[in-house]
């Protein structure tokens, strides 16, 4: 896709129309006086510099390939994605291993992997640590296995297909890479990256007082925010953010997981000129948060006026760059999906919801990282849902969290989605909050994570066996998958489809 400042993202097929309009405008400019021609040239040079800068800062947001949003049909054969279309995974040994087998005419299937350990389970499947046979060096993956019969009987086949299609689109350092997917007579299988650091929920449990420091929480929240921003650029509403779904890679950086609840919709990303604001930091006092849902004063849209009469010089913009914004607001899902403690009010009230639910869950997420618990948890699930709807946001009396962190959480946990931070301007608005001051968004992958996982000793999982499993062993593996998928039910995980 082509990125044009001040305009929507446009495909190569339609970009020439905009170029034609630009050429017509330039022709008119040639009829003006020389002084205006010189001024126009200065403005064009400035614009080119800004385009170059924003392109650099947008590297983590949008891949340089077209996104195919069309639905894909099931393929009974193995499918692996060409790593040339995944720029951020260059030099990945997992791709080398997969492509090496593919170059020899091998179509990956379940028999090409040695199952080492069950890592966890979700609502529609279980995840296993697996080793790719015949790979040199030895290569490990996480394989999500979903039972076909169970998906059909529970009316969740579409969710499994949606997850696979979404994973096939993703190309981002904080999102999963789908190396291959295939199916057998009984199972759908997704082959992804194995994250040796576990998830943020388990890591939080190991921290003093079971909560992260503010610096650590800021680091993890920053990377999650970039992942959500990228998803929204693709027209994907995540809908399942919680620490359990934020995995920690072996380098300490994060990866979002589980996309079976995600919602896809159309989206129109745009570049909008921003102006540097000044004045107050927009801190809200606790009384205001209790009395109602207020939007922090630090967050007001900063739009570029399109009138030519009001053009400003370069100095007037104070070096600010265009903002890339994309909020898929043209969707109103009626699905009741998610985890009780993270459900947004509009989901519970069945009012229809869009991308703003991700910003609500982002607020709950930050609150839990800093306090070790979610803000609306009740004695039971019904009490929790009631608290989300009817109780104001409160912070613990002993809370040592800074006022800027509280202010961000208050803005995110506004019960009316239209008044919530980022409802119109998305992650761009959140990035400018004082809580994230000092974060270098373009270079965050180079930052030192607050926690580095211990190296995994895979030898304790590897069992001595032949390269080719006999039929009896294959049947044993199939039964193991059956039992694991049948037991994968989470009582705190609810999914009700109204339509």
Swiss-Prot record:
Residues 1-92 are annotated as: Disordered. GO terms for biological process: root hair cell development. Its EC number is 2.7.11.1. Residues 437-499 form the AGC-kinase C-terminal domain. It comes from the Eukaryota. It is an enzyme of class 2 (transferase). ATP binds at residues 119-127, 144. It catalyses: L-seryl-[protein] + ATP = O-phospho-L-seryl-[protein] + ADP + H(+); L-threonyl-[protein] + ATP = O-phospho-L-threonyl-[protein] + ADP + H(+). Involved in root hair growth and morphogenesis. Plants over-expressing RHS3 show altered root hair morphology, such as spiral, bent or branched hairs. This is Serine/threonine-protein kinase RHS3.
């Amino acid at each position: 896709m082509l990125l044009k400042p001040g305009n929507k993202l446009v495909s190569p097929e339609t970009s020439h129309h905009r170029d034609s309009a630009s050429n017509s405008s330039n022709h008119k400019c040639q009829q003006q006086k020389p002084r205006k021609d010189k001024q126009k040239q200065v403005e064009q040079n400035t614009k080119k510099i800004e385009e170059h800068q924003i392109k650099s800062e947008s590297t983590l947001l949008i891949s340089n390939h077209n996104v195919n949003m069309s639905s894909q049909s099931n393929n009974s054969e193995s499918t692996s994605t060409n790593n040339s279309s995944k720029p951020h995974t260059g030099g990945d040994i997992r791709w080398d291993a997969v492509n090496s087998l593919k170059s020899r005419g091998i179509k990956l299937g379940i028999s090409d992997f040695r199952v080492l350990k069950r890592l966890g389970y979700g609502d529609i499947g279980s995840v296993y640590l697996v080793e790719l046979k015949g790979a040199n060096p030895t290569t490990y993956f996480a394989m999500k296995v979903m039972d076909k019969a169970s998906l059909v009987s529970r009316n969740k086949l579409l969710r499994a297909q949606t997850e696979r299609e979404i994973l096939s689109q993703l190309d981002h350092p904080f999102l999963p890479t789908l190396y291959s997917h295939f199916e057998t007579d009984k199972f759908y299988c997704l082959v992804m990256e194995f994250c040796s650091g576990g998830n943020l929920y388990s890591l939080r449990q190991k921290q003093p007082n079971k909560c992260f420091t503010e610096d650590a929480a800021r680091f993890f929240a920053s990377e999650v925010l970039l992942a959500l921003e990228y998803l929204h650029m693709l027209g994907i509403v995540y809908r399942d953010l919680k620490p359990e779904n934020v995995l920690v890679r072996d380098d300490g950086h994060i990866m979002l997981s589980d996309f079976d609840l995600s919602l896809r919709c159309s989206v129109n990303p745009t570049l909008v000129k921003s102006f540097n604001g000044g004045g107050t930091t927009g801190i809200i006092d606790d009384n205001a948060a209790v009395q109602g849902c207020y939007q922090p004063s630090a967050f007001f849209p900063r739009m570029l006026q399109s009138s030519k009469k009001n053009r400003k010089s370069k100095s007037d913009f104070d070096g600010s760059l265009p903002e890339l914004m994309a909020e898929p607001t043209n969707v109103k899902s009626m699905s009741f999906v998610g985890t009780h403690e993270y459900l947004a009010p509009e989901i519970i009230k069945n009012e229809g919801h869009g991308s703003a639910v991700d910003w609500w869950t982002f607020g709950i997420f930050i609150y839990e990282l800093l306090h070790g618990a979610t803000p609306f948890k009740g004695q039971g699930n019904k009490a929790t849902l009631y608290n989300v709807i009817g109780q104001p946001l409160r912070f613990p009396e002993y809370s040592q969290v800074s006022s800027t962190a509280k202010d961000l959480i208050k803005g995110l946990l506004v019960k009316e989605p239209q008044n919530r931070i980022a409802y119109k301007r998305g992650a761009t608005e959140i990035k400018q909050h004082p809580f994230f001051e000092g974060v270098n968004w373009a270079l965050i992958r180079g930052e030192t994570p607050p926690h580095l996982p211990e190296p995994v000793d895979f030898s304790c999982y590897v069992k001595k066996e032949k390269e080719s499993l006999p039929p009896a062993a294959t049947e044993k593996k199939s039964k193991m998958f059956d039992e694991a998928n049948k037991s994968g039910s989470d009582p705190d995980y609810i999914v009700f489809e109204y339509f």
